């Protein structure tokens, strides 16, 4: 059975170092897709690079935890900025869902304005779209526009009223992250997916060159390690040997 593998690099537009790392991992490695933060400091640079790479799938990385929102969000921001306090608000069930739905639409339009096309799919920074309160909003939005959505199926296993026409990969992994960033780890992810009989798989990654913006991230130098692994010739060969076809969210 042919299996589609989407290797999606998050954080396109975060910084020039991030952008260049993603492009390097696409041109000379196994990355096939990326998702862009439309409020990132280097989003215009990302759009410029993407125009030189028309085959690179570019989706939208919905942001509710970093930087300035595109719309006014007095219920979620502090001093005009987004932040990780969204987790506490989710636990307390005090999320301003109307604001979040409006911000999603505004970021989507911002993506179209910057990239000149619709995104291939949606996911989110720090996986906030998987919050139980937020997921139905994003799922309906994606289904209405006919675009795919990153789904951690174990997280939404008992979710009600999912749109029947919502597109996603059968499998998703965020395990290629943190301390264990190795070729062996990547291949274990593929083998586990194949064992489950999944016909499509998304593997999340964050390859980057380190610059001043990336240095401010709690997840900094591992991005360089990711880049090294993802551009390994032996990894590309091992993926092909396992029968995976590189693809984007337009292929599912």
Curated annotation (Swiss-Prot):
Q: Which reaction does it catalyse?
A: N,N'-diacetylchitobiose + H2O = N-acetyl-beta-D-glucosaminyl-(1->4)-D-glucosamine + acetate; diacetylchitobiose-6'-phosphate + H2O = N'-monoacetylchitobiose-6'-phosphate + acetate
What is the enzyme's class at the highest EC level? hydrolase
Which InterPro entries is this protein grouped with?
COD_ChbG_bac (IPR022948), Glyco_hydro/deAcase_b/a-brl (IPR011330), YdjC-like (IPR006879)
Give the intrachain disulfide bonds: none
User: Annotated Gene Ontology MF terms?
Assistant: chitin disaccharide deacetylase activity; deacetylase activity; metal ion binding
Query: Which of this chain's residues are annotated to bind Mg(2+)?
Result: 61, 125
Q: In which pathway does it act?
A: Glycan degradation; chitin degradation
Q: Is Cell inner membrane one of the keywords UniProt gives this record? A: no
Q: Which UniProt keywords apply?
A: Carbohydrate metabolism, Chitin degradation, Cytoplasm, Hydrolase, Magnesium, Metal-binding, Polysaccharide degradation
Where is it localised? Cytoplasm
- GO cellular component annotations, sorted alphabetically? cytoplasm
EC assignment: the record states 3.5.1.105
| Cofactor needs | Mg(2+)
Pfam families xref list: YdjC (PF04794)
Query: Which GO biological-process labels does this protein carry?
Result: chitin catabolic process; diacetylchitobiose catabolic process; polysaccharide catabolic process
Please give the superkingdom of this protein's source. Bacteria
Work out whether the entry's keyword set contains Metal-binding.
Answer: yes
Q: What does this protein do?
A: Involved in the degradation of chitin. ChbG is essential for growth on the acetylated chitooligosaccharides chitobiose and chitotriose but is dispensable for growth on cellobiose and chitosan dimer, the deacetylated form of chitobiose. Deacetylation of chitobiose-6-P and chitotriose-6-P is necessary for both the activation of the chb promoter by the regulatory protein ChbR and the hydrolysis of phosphorylated beta-glucosides by the phospho-beta-glucosidase ChbF.
The similarity annotation says:
Belongs to the YdjC deacetylase family. ChbG subfamily.
Q: How does it assemble?
A: Homodimer.
- Alphabetized PANTHER family for the sequence: CARBOHYDRATE DEACETYLASE (PTHR31609:SF1), YDJC DEACETYLASE FAMILY MEMBER (PTHR31609)
Q: What is this protein called?
A: Chitooligosaccharide deacetylase
Organism in which the protein naturally occurs: Salmonella paratyphi A (strain AKU_12601)
For this protein's source organism, the top of the classification is: Bacteria, Pseudomonadati, Pseudomonadota, Gammaproteobacteria, Enterobacterales
Give the gene that encodes this protein: chbG
């Amino acid at each position: 059975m042919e299996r589609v593998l989407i290797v999606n690099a998050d954080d396109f537009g975060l910084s020039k170092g991030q952008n260049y790392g993603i492009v390097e991992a696409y041109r000379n490695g196994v990355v096939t897709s990326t998702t862009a933060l439309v409020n990132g400091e280097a989003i215009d640079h990302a759009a410029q690079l993407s125009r030189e790479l028309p085959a690179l799938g570019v989706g939208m990385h919905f942001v509710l935890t970093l930087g300035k929102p595109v719309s006014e969000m007095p219920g979620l921001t502090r001093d005009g900025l987004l932040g990780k306090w969204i987790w506490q608000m989710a636990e307390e069930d005090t999320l301003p869902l109307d604001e979040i739905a409006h911000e999603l639409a505004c970021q989507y339009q911002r993506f179209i304005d910057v990239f000149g096309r619709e995104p291939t799919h949606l996911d989110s920074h720090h996986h906030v779209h998987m919050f139980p309160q937020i997921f139905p909003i994003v799922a309906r939005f994606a289904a209405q526009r006919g675009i795919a959505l990153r789904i951690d199926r174990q997280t939404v296993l008992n979710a009600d009223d999912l749109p029947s026409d919502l597109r996603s990969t059968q499998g998703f992994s965020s395990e290629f992250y943190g301390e264990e960033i190795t070729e062996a780890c990547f291949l274990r992810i593929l083998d586990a997916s194949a064992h489950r009989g999944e016909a499509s798989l998304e593997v999340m990654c964050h390859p980057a060159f380190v610059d001043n913006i990336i240095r401010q991230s709690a997840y900094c130098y591992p991005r360089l390690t990711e880049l090294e692994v993802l551009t390994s010739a032996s990894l590309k060969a091992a993926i092909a040997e396992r029968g995976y076809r590189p693809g984007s969210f337009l292929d599912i």
